[in-house]
């Protein structure tokens, strides 16, 4: 598990704007209904971002993260993966996520992502990014191989060994990535060996896309957490890199 119910995202360095959040139910092309949370900035900065959660789906950490993005001016939409198998119920600590993770289909993930991006673009035709955490980081890298018109993707501690129903792992598909990538990893994360991170960097070179792969040497998996004060400097740097990445590739995508 990546984040529990007590986890909260660190505050961004440029926080100070106002934001409004609302729960939504979106519908994919196949009729699947899934939960989402939209955070709307009072003063939009010209970009928007789709948030892929960890294995627990759309829980409080990601609703808060959407609001933190919106407070920097970035319109944000966090989505849940499990509408097809777990319905629309809240995803708290009692949610038994693994049976639903095992039923995930990559084609269904892409369908839900398309519906979410369509919703964002209907409300504002601005550059769109994707950010994901843990399994969401893996899915972010896989999504980056699709023709979705993204400006860039950001992957936190993306696992590279999960094969989604024979589609291949994030590492298998890395040479097919189409958009700029910011990858953020913990050097003390036992689940993601440094050799895999180095191989991801190499395969993104082969893909020919701009990329910045960053490892924080002593940080564990899930270091990006307000209560993980030992890694506050890494979290602050991750925020700075994310906002700079969004600003840079918002300009180049227009």
Model regions and ranges:
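N-terminal cap/leader regions of alpha/beta-hydrolase-fold enzymes
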Residues: 1-254
